[in-house]
A protein has these predicted regions:
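Hydrophobic core segments of alpha-helical transmembrane domains in multi-pass membrane transport
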Residues: 16-30, 125-133, 166-170, 212, ...
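Long, contiguous bundles of hydrophobic transmembrane helices that form the permeation core
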Residues: 2-14, 35-50, 57, 239-352, ...
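Core transmembrane alpha-helical segments of multi-pass membrane transporters/permeases
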Residues: 13-22, 50-142, 322-385
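Alpha-helical transmembrane segments of multi-pass membrane proteins
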Residues: 125, 156-171, 196-214, 237, ...
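Membrane-core helix-loop-helix motifs of multi-pass transport proteins
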Residues: 2-16, 184-274, 293-300, 463-497, ...
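Membrane-interfacial loop-to-helix junctions in multi-pass transporters
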Residues: 116-122, 150-162, 194-200, 357-364, ...
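C-terminal transmembrane helix pair
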Residues: 11, 394-507
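Hydrophobic alpha-helical transmembrane segments of multi-pass integral membrane proteins
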Residues: 126, 155-186, 367-370, 377, ...
Length: 507
């Protein structure tokens, strides 16, 4: 008999998603299948198309009168100018349909289909990894880190603070989510060189960006499209969303300061202390913190080009209509320029690119596997049933109870439909009119949608959490230990602000 038992390890990200896939299959047998009729705008024929399960598609003129007849309180211009591109659920059209049970074969198909659907994100991640591999070959990272650690000695938290603020602003303005993956390769070595751990890395980037996205002010992918789907200007409720951003941001920064201070005083305090060497080897194996590396003009130029790729990406998303193909193209172009000015042999830069890309294969596959869960739920036709049940759950409540109920409903729906824009066009045309029945403004429901679904963002394995943790080698249980205080903080802030809006409106 062994003197000591091996410590039980938490399942890997792949195993967690596989278990969730099996649960999703089980739900397609337990939850009745159902569907809302969906309205979409045909940009070619310039008319509305209504899709109802079991009957041929119906065509309607693209007019305000049609929208009024269907009880959709959305301006026609939001369809014609392309703001709303996804099908909108039509209120009061839910119907039960034949059961769409799924099995093991469907699950395997969903894994493949999910990977194909996120191919653009995967290519972006591979190019990002390749870029990092090339820059590591040049020695630019090593030289830059040595320079930074000397300049910030004694004031290391200033770097964490600056990153948190930038991520908060990026989240609230343009909803940085998948794009945040691009920041880890540049920032993780910085945090490690400053003496921090993997938790600080994910906290300053993912946690701060998610809090900013939760309290979105002008984010076109959540609060803007949700407001349009609710039939109101997105500026309504802006004041409370801004206040939430300030309070939520202060909560994240204060929490990060507490954790960093504890970590600096005692490295064994780290929530990921047992995994520290593997994480260090992953990101710092090509970097010697004690080496003297000359920070030449060429290396400075390479880091300037590398750093410039990120504000270019943010600008493209916000103002240029970019998505992952365009972002991948810009990163590849900058990588090619770096290859030419690196001064390295052709074989070295190519090997650096392929090696860097290969190290992110696991991360890319996790994204495809997470998408497979959503495919099973969609094909099982149970998402609309869950929404219909939730709608009846909060219908008829008084204002304060109603809005907290909405917050909880959207927390749950954030697990079922992890896409912010997808949840907005699915749920908002159904949920927003309920606000009229209890006598509160629709913008409060929009806030409940945004704050609720992003509480789940911190936890949902079907979202970006497992992608991030896979990239940094953090077990899911260690993440839960770290993030739960922030989840509680956001729930309290959201509840107080929602109740304050309801009571202020009632006066």
């Amino acid at each position: 008999m062994e003197a000591s038992k091996k410590k039980m390890k938490f399942p890997s990200a792949f195993s967690i998603l596989f278990i969730i896939l099996l649960i999703a299959i089980g739900l397609t047998w337990l939850i009745p299948s159902g569907s809302y009729s969906k309205l979409s705008y045909d940009t070619t024929e310039h008319h509305f198309i209504v899709k109802t399960h079991g009957i041929p598609d119906q065509s309607y003129p693209a007019t305000e009168q049609t929208l009024n007849q269907l009880n959709i309180k959305i301006q026609l211009s939001n369809f014609t100018n392309g703001i709303i591109k996804k099908p909108i659920a039509i209120p009061d059209t839910y119907q039960r349909i034949e059961q769409h049970e799924k099995g093991i074969t469907d699950m395997i198909h969903a894994m493949v289909d999910g990977t194909i659907e996120v191919a653009d994100i995967m290519i972006f991640i591979f190019i990002l990894g390749g870029m990092i591999g090339v820059i590591n070959k040049t020695g630019a990272f090593n030289a830059g880190l040595m320079s930074l650690t000397k300049k910030t000695k004694g004031n290391e938290f200033s770097v964490v603070f600056a990153v948190c603020v930038l991520m908060l602003l990026g989240g609230t303005a343009c909803g940085i989510e998948e794009e945040a993956v691009a920041f880890y390769p540049i920032l993780v070595p910085v945090f490690l060189a400053l003496g921090y751990d993997s938790i600080v890395c994910v906290g300053a980037i993912f946690l701060a960006a998610s809090m900013g996205t939760a309290f979105s002010t002008i984010n076109p992918f959540s609060v803007v499209i949700a407001s349009n789907a609710a039939g109101i200007p997105f500026t309504e409720g802006m004041g409370f969303r801004t206040l939430g951003l300030i309070l939520g941001g202060a909560c994240v920064i204060a929490y990060m300061y507490w954790y960093c201070k504890k970590l600096r005083a005692n490295p064994e305090f780290s929530y990921t202390y047992d995994d520290r060497q593997a994480f260090y080897d992953l990101y710092m194996k090509d970097i010697d913190p004690n080496a003297t590396v000359e920070f030449t003009f060429r290396r400075k130029l390479i880091l300037i080009l590398f750093s410039g790729a990120f504000p270019l990406m943010v600008w493209g998303v916000m103002f240029g209509g970019w998505w992952f193909p365009q972002m991948a193209t810009s990163f590849l172009a900058i990588t090619i320029i770096i290859m030419f000015i690196s001064g390295l042999p052709e074989k070295d830069v190519v090997n650096g690119f392929t090696h860097g890309a290969s190290e992110l294969v696991g991360v890319a596959l996790i994204i495809g596997l997470a998408r497979a869960v959503n495919i099973i739920l969609e094909q099982g036709m149970i998402s609309d049933t869950i929404l219909d049940y939730m709608t009846h759950l909060v219908d008829g409540m008084n204002g304060g109870v109603f809005i907290i109920g909405q917050l909880i409903v959207f927390i749950f729906l954030g697990l079922v439909v992890p896409s912010s824009s997808g949840l907005a066009v699915l749920a908002m045309p159904i949920m927003a009119p309920l606000a009229d029945t209890v006598g509160i403004p629709r913008d409060i429901v929009v806030s409940a949608y945004n704050w609720g679904q992003y509480i789940m963002l911190f936890l949902a394995p079907t979202g970006l959490v497992l992608v991030t943790l896979q990239m940094l080698g953090i077990p899911f249980n260690k993440w839960l230990k770290f993030v739960m205080p922030i989840v509680g903080c956001q729930f309290v802030i959201s509840s107080i602000l929602l109740l304050a809006q309801v009571f202020m409106y009632a006066q």
